[in-house]
Amino acid sequence: MGRRSSDTEEESRSKRKKKHRRRSSSSSSSDSRTYSRKKGGRRPRSDSRSWSRDRQLRSHSYERRRRRRSSSSSSYGSRRKRSRSRSRGRGKPYRVQRSRSKSRTRRSRSRPRPRSHSRSSERSSHRRTRSRSRDRDRRKVRDKEKREKEKDKGKDKEVHSIKRGDSGNIKAGLEHLPPAEQAKARLQLVLEAAAKADEALKAKERSEEEAKRRKEEDQATLVEQVKRVKEIEAIESDSFVQQTFRSSKDVKKAVEPSEVQHVTAASGPASAAAEPPSTGKEIDPDSIPTAIKYQDDNSLAHPNLFIEKAEAEEKWFKRLIALRQERLMGSPVA
């Protein structure tokens, strides 16, 4: 009996402990629920503001990610449309997009912010347009070069085809003729080709002669220039002495007949008999004028004006004959 009573007491105690534990756990859970309700029922203003800011930042970060994904996944056409719309509305301010939240309260709370990727996208679009314009210019230059090369090739082909066509036409034209006429026609063609070759050679020789002549003229001018420079240097030097001017024309004329006289004296009478007598008049050195002589007749007009008409015409006729002889023979007029 004593053992049974002790067992029952222990069982009752364990049951009481279990009930007490259950009650304590339920009370703690109810207390936590009530505390959480109290806590969630009213919040201080600072906590609500920080919570709204966190939500705004999260919404903005989500918007940025979504825009980046859409811009990266968009096609070439959408990029082009976007660049056109930006270029049209450059002067206008950028449209402000609000955060697309589900509730209206959150939408009203969110602040408007401009696009963050607008400047970078504009720069990239400018770079693209520049690179495209450069590519277009390069393509145009390449196309022009290709066209010029094709034109040159076409001209060369035309020249070769014309030459071949000429030879073919000649052969075709000579086929229906008899052999004698064919030989004559071929001879004529050969003569024409030889004449053309002679003309080309003559033109070449003329060009070479002209080049030589120009070279000689350049050399002569160089010699004259050097002589002139030396004369100028001699005049400018300190050892230069001024002298009176003497004409070399009269001196040459006087020297020539004196040389002729010396030659005739040395050759003897045989050479004098063999040679015909000279028709020219011998000029004495005493007769050469050395000073200017003035004729003061106290007359207002020249004496040639008082000559008769027939005498003046005869003198003029003689002068014309002398000038004609000078032009034809090259001898100076006395």
UniProtKB/Swiss-Prot annotation:
| Post-translational modification comment from the UniProt entry | Phosphorylated.
Subunit organization: Interacts (via Arg/Ser-rich domain) with LUC7L3, RBM39 and RSF1.
Compositionally skewed regions (Low complexity) per UniProt: 265-278
- Cell compartment(s), UniProt: Nucleus; Nucleus speckle; Cytoplasm
Q: Where is the composition biased (Basic residues)?
A: 14-24, 78-118
Q: Summarize the protein's role.
A: Plays a role in pre-mRNA splicing. Involved in both constitutive and alternative pre-mRNA splicing. May have a role in the recognition of the 3' splice site during the second step of splicing.
| Gene Ontology CC | cytoplasm; nuclear speck; nucleus
What keywords does the record list, in alphabetical order? Answer: Coiled coil, Cytoplasm, mRNA processing, mRNA splicing, Nucleus, Phosphoprotein
Q: Does the keyword Nucleotidyltransferase apply?
A: no
- Coiled-coil annotation: which residues? 180-236
Question: Which superkingdom heads the taxonomic lineage of this protein's source?
Answer: Eukaryota
Q: Which organism is it from?
A: Mus musculus
| Disordered: region residues | 1-179, 198-220, 246-290
What InterPro entries would the database entry show? Answer: SRRP53 (IPR034604)
**One biological-process term from Gene Ontology?**
nucleocytoplasmic transport
- Return the Basic and acidic residues bias intervals: 1-13, 44-62, 132-166, 198-218, 247-256
List the protein's name: Serine/Arginine-related protein 53
